[in-house]
Amino acid sequence: MLKFKYSDFIKAIFLLFISIGVFIISAGLFYEESYHYKKDDYFTHYALTLDEVKDIPVISDNYEFYYYSPDGTQRLTNGVVFYNPMPEHKAELVKYIETLGFKKTKSIPWSYGNINEVWIKGHDEVNLVQDDKNRTINISFIKQ
């Protein structure tokens, strides 16, 4: 006669609950189409931040990362907004962009009162925006 083992049943139920939990957590991670996060949010920082963004020189003590997922025609965008940086530190970001192999294609000084620079490498793009009015420097990497 067939013997039913309670321990095998409990193991199967436990494994089922663990699997459902992992699925819900991983699905929830990518549910949002945009994230704003700090470096100390380790899981989000590790999972969503591009290597180019992880290695950006820090030019201010106050900064936050952002991520926009590719959806439809929107491309993956990941970057950093630096609040109250010293304007002369922008040169560090320019040097970093150049070391990655990006070439400056245009500078738009009239873009809503900001200084907007666009850098291209292949199909990838970097936007560097200096907003003197709000005292921010925004660098974003846009991937194809």
Where are these regions (language model features)?
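Intrinsic disorder/low-complexity detector
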Residues: 10, 57, 73, 80, ...
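Residues that cap or initiate secondary-structure elements
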Residues: 46, 86-89, 134
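N-terminal leader/targeting segments
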Residues: 2-75
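Alpha-helix initiation/capping motif
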Residues: 2-5, 86, 131
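N-terminal start-of-chain detector that recognizes signal peptides
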Residues: 38, 51-56, 91, 110-113, ...
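Mature extracytoplasmic domains of secretory-pathway proteins
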Residues: 56-109
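Non-cytosolic head/periplasmic domains of membrane-anchored proteins
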Residues: 98, 102-144
